[in-house]
A protein has these predicted regions:
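Intrinsically disordered, low-complexity
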Residues: 1-46, 138-148
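Aromatic- and glycine-rich peptidoglycan recognition patches
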Residues: 26, 73, 77-90, 110-148
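Short acidic-hydrophobic sequence patches enriched in Asp/Glu that either
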Residues: 31, 59, 135
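Short, structured active-site "lid" loops
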Residues: 102
């Protein structure tokens, strides 16, 4: 039994190590589409102001920070500071994986005119991570490219 458990643990551990290595290595080869795909898997999870958990509750800037951290990018924690992250671009140049910063809010552009973000408004009763189809639903301050 001990040998079987150790073998099982080793296989499990190796799988996790491989996964972590591939994620860490992805920091340099990440694509905007990969960022959006990763971010989108958390849709429906709760909004918590000041939260840092993609599964148990997070706010808008924490969401952006944690999604990019998965790919090896270190972003500031608050949206105002995220407005200076990466490289400034125009909205017309934007593509999937770029971030859009509003007054007091930040989101990840999906490339189809929409955003994925942690919001404290509908459709989820107490807000949550969601997709919104109109990135220009309110005036924005900056569009930034994190993944080149």
């Amino acid at each position: 039994n001990t040998t079987e458990n150790n073998d099982s643990y080793t296989e499990e551990s190796s799988g996790n190590d491989y996964e972590e290595e591939s994620n860490a290595g992805g920091g340099y080869s990440a694509t905007g589409e990969a960022v959006v795909a990763y971010a989108s898997q958390f849709i429906g999870n709760p909004y918590v102001y000041g939260g840092n958990s993609l599964t148990n509750g997070i706010d808008c800037s924490g969401f952006v920070q944690q999604v990019f951290a998965h790919f090896g990018y270190s972003l500031p924690r608050v949206s105002d500071a995220q407005a200076g992250a990466g490289r400034g671009i125009s909205y017309s140049e934007s593509r999937a994986g770029d971030i859009i910063v509003y007054s007091g809010h930040v989101a990840i552009l999906t490339g189809d005119g929409g955003i994925v973000h942690a919001s404290n408004s509908a459709p989820y009763p107490q807000g949550g991570i969601k997709y919104s189809s109109n990135a220009l639903y309110r005036p924005y301050i900056a569009v930034r490219r994190i993944v080149d």
